[in-house]
Amino acid sequence: MSDLVKVTLPDGSQKEAPRGTPVIDFVKGQIGPGLAKAAYFARLDGEPVDLSRAIERDARLEIVTTRNPEALEVARHDAAHVMASVVQKLYPGTQVTIGPAIEDGFYYDFARETPFTPEDLERIEKATNEAIKADLPFVRSEISMEAALALFEGMGERYKVEIVKDIAAKGAKTLTLYKHGDWVDFCLGPHGPSTGRIGVVKLLNVAGAYWRGDAKNAMLQRIYGTAFFDKKELDAHLAKLEEVKKRDHRRLGPQLGLFTFHEFAPGAPFWLPAGTVLYNVLEDAMRRLVLKNGYQEVKTPLLFNKRLWETSGHWGKYRENMFLVVDSESDPALPLEDRCSFSLKPMNCPSHHLIYRMDKRSYRELPVRYFTTDALHRNEASGSLGGLTRVRQFEQDDAHIYLREEQVTDEVLRIFELMKVVYGAFGLGFEATFSTRPEQRIGDDALWDRAEALLRKSLDATGLKWTLNAGDGAFYGPKIDMLVTDSLGRKWQTCTIQLDYAAPERFDLTFVGEDNKEHRPVVIHRAIYGSFERFVAILVEHYAGAFPAWLAPVQARVVTVSDRFEAWAREAGEALQARGWRVEVDASSDKLGAKIRNAQLAKIPFTLVVGEKEVEAKGVSPRRHGGEDLKTMPLETFAELMAREATAPF
């Protein structure tokens, strides 16, 4: 064996180095000190590794610098380790569990009887940043599972012991440890060279979290934080977080009279008058769009016998997420679960399959497109509920399309065109992910191979860039998920396009082909908004509650300078209402400034001032939300303005 290894760089060039050379030494000696200084971790043949990793074989080498967002993700994981070490030093007896990097930050879960206070958080943050400045190296090692178990048992870390045992049960023989100073944790890595490279850390908040996400387990304390290489970047991020707080739909929704919740119906929103208008505008717009694009609207029952869910596979794969209903005619002596032979529907697809199956179908009819906005119920864990983004009762702009296999690509392209119309109307950017077969699934591998290949081909045909999300498909088929980007640059999952070969088999769905023989259709499951509830949450935060005129619950409010002008104010308001616009009149005794301010706080797109000159001109003086005053104009001119700006774009 040669004592030299060949290292291939991203530009295709090759360099030689002594076998066993650490990556960082290779970079310093063969590339240059500038790259070595900027390097945070590396990839050897695509595998993320520490800069201290020895190059033992011919390999492709990529250096990841602090300019790469992936380096910041690793630095945040580094920060989680440092914070955990600080917590255990400041609060002896605290048990550590897990601490990953997450989007925009990191967290670590701790087991401690006494809750962390805001003062504790400040103390931990200060000590964490001091520990970072100590610039301690991260040192990687590997030990046997037996040694790892003995190590963490000796440390009294019962949660770590539990994880080690689980890893060993899966067949692992060794465990990777990372140590900085005298603190050690097991971790796949990679980590940065030393704590001093992390940058600056800010701790954000403390929240409760069940061990392993199970409400039956102990409640832990989760400390959230973030880290940036540069303080200016941190300050900009914190300013963004403040803006996010201001836009939080859980605050703005009730404030604007859109929705609320009640303890008697956890996870089920109450839509207030303004919110109901908003909801209906969204629903009506989508209905118009799909009906003129070949869809047929259907409605199906809310409650179904379990035989439907056994046929679809939900009873075996999804039952824990369903609301089960006791059959009143069942034997009371039976166990409760055996008496539950009905369920509220968590999905529309099985009932749509029943409709499709009611008639004999010809290939000439396909695609058959069913659309609905029926209510759905899913038994989400109480701890996961949050505003409108995670609820138990919701509606979707749900559609199921029955078609021949050769029609799939064209149909996916049609769906993408609808999606572009919808997201474009809201000014939302978008990108796609492709999710493949999960561990829990129905159908054989050959069927999944076929479905994944076809959906991948269809996604490629759109020309849209996409990323792979392996193992996250639905239990019955692969899917395309759309991530929309809001005005703050945040990404939200909305649209889904799922390809299903299994349902036609399970429900015996057929069509008569050109050969006069029966064939199986393919089913596409698709939604563009996703759930209305989640989409409303996105829009509230995207617009900060200041909806465009076509979407706003109240599009214009007429305000009087004094009660002398009430008659014309009401006449103008009624004339606009007669044209279909959503208009209110404020003829209260409040001063004009207060009326205008109230309209601005309510985020109404147009405030129409009516005083003496407006009465004389039979007009109004519009003021846009945000402060732009338009000149006094005849009422008819304003109605034309409304027609341009307040008409639904789809």
UniProtKB/Swiss-Prot annotation:
Alphabetically ordered keywords of this record: Aminoacyl-tRNA synthetase, ATP-binding, Cytoplasm, Ligase, Metal-binding, Nucleotide-binding, Protein biosynthesis, RNA-binding, tRNA-binding, Zinc
Root EC class: ligase
GO biological process: threonyl-tRNA aminoacylation
Residues that hold Zn(2+) according to the record: 349, 400, 525
Gene3D superfamilies: 3.10.20.30, 3.30.54.20, Anticodon-binding domain, Bira Bifunctional Protein, Domain 2, Threonyl-trna Synthetase, Chain A, domain 2
Region (Catalytic): 248-548
EC identifiers of the protein: 6.1.1.3
Predominant location category: cytoplasm
Swiss-Prot/TrEMBL cofactor(s): Zn(2+)
InterPro entries to which the protein is assigned, alphabetical: aa-tRNA-synt_IIb, aa-tRNA-synth_II, aa-tRNA-synth_II/BPL/LPL, Anticodon-bd, Anticodon-bd_dom_sf, Beta-grasp_dom_sf, TGS, TGS-like
A GO term, aspect molecular function: tRNA binding
Catalytic activity: tRNA(Thr) + L-threonine + ATP = L-threonyl-tRNA(Thr) + AMP + diphosphate + H(+)
Residue ranges of every copy of the TGS domain listed in the record: 3-65
GO CC, any one term: cytoplasm
Family: Belongs to the class-II aminoacyl-tRNA synthetase family.
Complexes and interactors: Homodimer.
NCBIfam families reported in the protein's UniProt record: thrS (TIGR00418)
HAMAP family: Thr_tRNA_synth (MF_00184)
Protein name: Threonine--tRNA ligase
The organism of origin for this protein: Anaeromyxobacter dehalogenans (strain 2CP-1 / ATCC BAA-258)
Gene for this chain: thrS
